[in-house]
Amino acid sequence: RYADDFKLFCRDYSTAKKTMMATKLWLQENLHLETSDEKSGVTNLRKNYTTFLGIKFKVVPSGKKWIVRSHMADKSKEKVIVKLKNVWKDIKNPSLQSRLNENISLYNAMVMGMHNYYCMATMVSKDFAEISYKVVGKSNGMNHNNRCNNIEKSGEISSEHINKKYGKSKQFRWINGRMIVPVGYVAHEFPKYKRRSVNKYLRKHDDIGNCISFEIMEYMM
């Protein structure tokens, strides 16, 4: 797939209209690419949200400045809820207890992956608090079903990476000795760009440690 989504930011409406027309002409004349009128347009970020790669954002006043406020996009949030609910149901399902460890590993991997991506949104903590309520609720309800393993509020955090990232959370739970990564425990992190020095044309590319967290890889395996 090609990365064909982009946003251009301008200070006023007239400049934005001119920039959009110039961009359309440039893409058509130089790259022979047609733009979609339905997906292209000008948005006033002081009044409305715009969505980009699963994140919706606008600007809000803060003192004498305007700052970005961003959330998970509505469609993205619904997809996350559906995916996590399906795995959580399998964890609770008495007939699937033989696959409990597999399902818990899948659930934890999904939660950590979603946190790693959506943490760039400034309001990600609020968004995942809502997701947590809809997916696991109070979670202790599982304890009323004697055929399921009880959810415990204390246990051992076996992964150093998870302990470093989630260890302070009071939302941690354990099932049959396996820890459940708290879906509602995430904070905003400023997005970082990939260093230009890390690419396949330079020797530094051989240092795979620049790109991959071995702690995460070890836990996933």
Residue ranges and their predicted role:
Residues 1-221:
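Non-catalytic terminal/accessory segments
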